């Protein structure tokens, strides 16, 4: 029962684990494909002419100018921006107070009409859409927003839904401040924006992360619970089996102590050459050998058969169970570990004699005895005589000093059975317990 329960739990846990794994894997793939972002980088090429320092020139005079050109892939197109090139002169809001371009009335220092210009706006105070829209309404060719306050080199894909007709990019804070410093020195800066690299980035949404985490935790809890249950059941089963083995060993020791021991003497029939050898060591019997006589009338060397009986509790030859033959009921917990020829514990008190009933039971479980041997127990109970007069023959008696008392009814039934010659009378275990009282 315990093993079938463990196997069922094992199959259930394995099926649950596989289904959960496949389900979570498919969901993760679905979330990953659904949560993806496509964005483009932008090459930012700025050109400006920085006046060369001339000590001899006056404040109003002009010396030579040094032309600078810088091109870096530092920009990132907005989410709703058209992916196209843009060119123009970089300008900021006319007033330092309106540099953030959050006010719709913000004025830019735009060049003369008909010349393209690009608005440079710092991040902050309002949405990207508001900044881009305010510049677009004043006819800017493009809008460049530089990051402020976060990671200096970070750029993001700006969302600006509703303003989709103007190129809008974001550049890092250092690059934006560099251009601002040039404009504050009244240096004209021209910017040329071109499309850079296309990027496809996959994201896992927070919902999917939470779902996968919960699924994983539940899966681990189920697996852990199954493992704990499995090992607890395995530990309990092992302990119960060891305990049952110890109890069976104790019962076997008790049974062995009730078996007759005999010392072979010179001239006994066991020493003859035609007598069967010991079935355990396959050696013949010699004088002074100590033998153990089992209830089935088989005998073996004591040193050979005792270890066998402790482990198996059966006759090495006919497989008769000595616990059953002696009427020693094992503990109920030991039933699962008993041999298959044991059909339940016997009721009634244990007997110290081999009775006709017990011999008949042995006969049914594959042991064939002659009529004289099968009735030897009954003869001993009724007449207290030896049915085989030959010296050296063995009569199984666990205690020669104690003879069990027999009721008058049992005497009459046994005597009638022997007078009629019914040597094959079969007495049940319950009848035997009523007839023979220890």
From Swiss-Prot:
Signal sequence segment: 1-34
Keyword presence, Metal-binding: yes
Originating species: Homo sapiens
Compartments, record wording: Membrane
Regions of this protein lying in the Cytoplasmic compartment: 230-438
One GO BP annotation of this record: ubiquitin-dependent protein catabolic process
Membrane topology according to the record: Single-pass type I membrane protein
Transmembrane segments: 209-229
Name of the gene: RNF150
Glycan-modified residues: 45, 125, 153, 186
Listed GO CC annotations: cytoplasm; membrane
Domain PA per the UniProt entry, residue ranges: 81-183
Keywords, alphabetical: Glycoprotein, Membrane, Metal-binding, Signal, Transmembrane, Transmembrane helix, Zinc, Zinc-finger
Zinc finger (RING-type): 278-319
GO molecular function: ubiquitin protein ligase activity; zinc ion binding
Main location (coarse class): membrane
Name used for this protein in its record: RING finger protein 150
Pfam families: PA (PF02225), zf-RING_2 (PF13639)
PANTHER family linked to this entry: E3 UBIQUITIN-PROTEIN LIGASE ATL42, RING FINGER PROTEIN 128
Keyword Transmembrane recorded: yes
Topology, Extracellular side: 35-208
């Amino acid at each position: 029962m315990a093993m079938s329960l463990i196997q069922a739990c094992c199959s259930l846990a394995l099926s649950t684990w596989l289904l959960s794994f496949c389900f979570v894997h498919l969901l993760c793939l679905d979330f990953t494909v659904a949560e993806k972002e496509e964005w483009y980088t932008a090459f930012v090429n700025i050109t400006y002419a920085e006046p060369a320092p001339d000590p001899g020139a006056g404040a109003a005079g002009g010396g030579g100018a040094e032309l600078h050109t810088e091109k870096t892939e530092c920009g990132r197109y907005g989410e709703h921006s058209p992916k196209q090139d843009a060119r123009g002169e970089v300008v900021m809001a006319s007033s330092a107070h309106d540099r953030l371009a959050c006010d719709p009335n913000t004025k830019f220092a735009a060049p003369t009409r008909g010349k393209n210009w690009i608005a440079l706006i710092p991040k902050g105070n309002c949405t990207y859409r508001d900044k881009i829209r305010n510049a677009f309404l004043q006819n800017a060719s493009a809008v460049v927003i530089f990051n402020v306050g976060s990671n200096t080199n970070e750029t993001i894909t700006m969302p600006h839904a509703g303003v989709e007709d103007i190129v809008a990019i974001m550049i890092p804070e250092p690059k934006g401040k560099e251009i601002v410093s040039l404009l504050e020195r009244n240096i004209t800066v021209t910017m040329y924006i071109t499309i850079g690299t296309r990027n496809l980035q996959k994201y896992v949404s927070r919902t999917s992360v939470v779902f996968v985490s919960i699924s994983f935790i539940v899966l681990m809890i189920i697996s852990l619970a199954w493992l704990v249950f499995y090992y607890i059941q395995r530990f309990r089963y092992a302990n119960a089996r060891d305990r049952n083995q110890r109890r069976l060993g104790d019962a076997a020791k008790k049974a062995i102590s009730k078996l007759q021991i005999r010392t072979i003497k010179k001239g006994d029939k066991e020493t003859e050459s035609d007598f069967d050898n010991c079935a355990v060591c396959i050696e013949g019997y010699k004088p002074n050998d100590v033998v153990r006589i089992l209830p089935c009338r088989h005998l073996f060397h004591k040193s050979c058969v005792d270890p066998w009986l402790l482990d198996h509790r059966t006759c090495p030859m006919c497989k008769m169970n000595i616990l059953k033959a002696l009427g020693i009921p094992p503990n109920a917990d030991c039933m699962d570990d008993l041999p298959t020829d044991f059909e339940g514990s016997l009721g009634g008190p244990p007997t110290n004699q081999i009775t006709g009933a017990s011999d008949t039971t042995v006969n049914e479980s594959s042991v064939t005895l002659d009529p004289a041997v099968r009735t030897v127990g009954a003869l001993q109970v009724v007449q207290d005589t030896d049915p085989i007069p030959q010296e050296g023959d063995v009569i199984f008696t666990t205690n020669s000093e104690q003879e069990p008392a027999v009721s008058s009814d049992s005497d009459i039934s046994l005597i009638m059975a022997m007078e009629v010659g019914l040597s094959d009378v079969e007495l049940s275990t319950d009848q035997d317990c009523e007839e023979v009282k220890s």
